[in-house]
Amino acid sequence: MNQAQGAIETARAAGADRYAPEEYGAAVAALEKSREMATQRDYRQALNFALDARERALDAARSGAERMAQVRSEAETAVRTAAQTLQIAQARAKSSGPARAADKTPAPLRDAITQAEKDLQEARSAIARQDYTPARDLARAIDQRVRDAIDAAEQPAAKAGRKPAR
């Protein structure tokens, strides 16, 4: 049972509780069943459940580490993409003219840039804390919001450039 408990703690440290919850939960349940059998003095069953718990915990640690690496990669990619989109938005905002650029930049785009800068910092902080799933989701949302703001800012400009129909 001690080996099973140690394997479960290792799995939790590897992120299995977040990234491989089914396998991790099965390991914990098997350990509980092992303890239950030991209190009933059925030591053979207790040993079987403890061995099962250890194997499940090792599988959970392996799966959790793999999934965590995948989500970390997705989060880092999403943050890079959002940062690039933010740079595009900032360039568009500056291209509205160096003098009084803030006055000429549409308010929704300006607001989206300001919020994206704050949210992007939060996504980077989440990655530093190893909270990869929220970081990935936040970065994807930032990217979409900024893209929508860029599109909205360009629509009036596109309409203004058209000639009236005769």
Q: Which residue stretches match the model-derived regions?
A:
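Long, charged/polar, soluble alpha-helical segments
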Residues: 1-166
